[in-house]
Amino acid sequence: MNKILIFASSVLFLILSSSFFIVKEGERGIVLQFGKVLRNNELKTVVYNPGLHFKWPFLETVKMLDARIHTMDNQADRFVTKEKKDLIVDSYIKWRINDFSRYYLATGGGDVFQAEVLLKRKFSDRLRSEIGRLNVKEIVTDSRGRLTTDVLNSLNKGSMNLEKSSLINVNSMNALGIHVVDVRIKQINLPVEVSDAIYNRMRAEREAVARSQRSQGQEKAEKLRASADYKVSIILSEARKEALIIKGQGEAEVTKLFAKNFNKEPDFYFFIRSLRAYENSFKNNRNIMLIDSDSQFFRYIKNMINIKNL
């Protein structure tokens, strides 16, 4: 009897534990009955909010789905602009589930990886289409906000305006039970080969500017040097002129003094002049002079010889 009671209690406990389930905060639960999504009388999917809930044991199973916002980083990819120029765009998407039944069916059982594969594919197509309508300047400046807004709207609504329609556009993320919350572009870069070409062109332009600046500097230096040389030549010329004037004035003063003293002491004047003449004449021992011995030139030498012989 005790064994039967224990067995019955165990079965009852198993049934009761299988009859209740808890949905955690940040999750939503959907019940599958024989593998199919459980719907209410209005044929809408029954979604269980956080809390304790009942289900039929063994007949129904519960699938928990993450109701929080997901962030999906996209690998940097190459896109072509309206000008047929390549850009490397790095971006990310924030999304959440807005239709748990459709999401469960579209992703093969609520697989997040499968959902993001489908989302990346649609996002890449929409971003490629939007970038193809813009030029580089519009993308990297004031059009970035409009670009991401257009991509966001096209992902949520598709290519058709269904605001007044109850149908789900198969081109929108609603077909996957997903709502895209935000789209952001992290970086926009040029391809490596384009960046290298631009860098080389900029370097060539800078080198050309540097050569031009150096050439202009050398030209200015030559002009300054020529101007300085000209000023120096003028200063030297003025100095020589002034020196010659001073020298002439000095010689004139000397001549004037000699003339004045000559009148007073003519013999002394002739004596000094003769000494200077002797000095200039006999500087070089190789000089040969043919002069009459009775010439006045040798008068003082003769006097010195006569004085010596006395």
Curated annotation (Swiss-Prot):
This is Protein HflC. The gene is hflC. It comes from the Bacteria. It holds the Pfam family Band_7. Keywords: Membrane, Transmembrane, Transmembrane helix. HflC and HflK may interact to form a multimeric complex. The keyword Transmembrane helix applies. The chain crosses the membrane at residues 3-23. It is found in: Membrane. The lineage of its organism: Bacteria, Pseudomonadati, Pseudomonadota, Gammaproteobacteria, Enterobacterales.
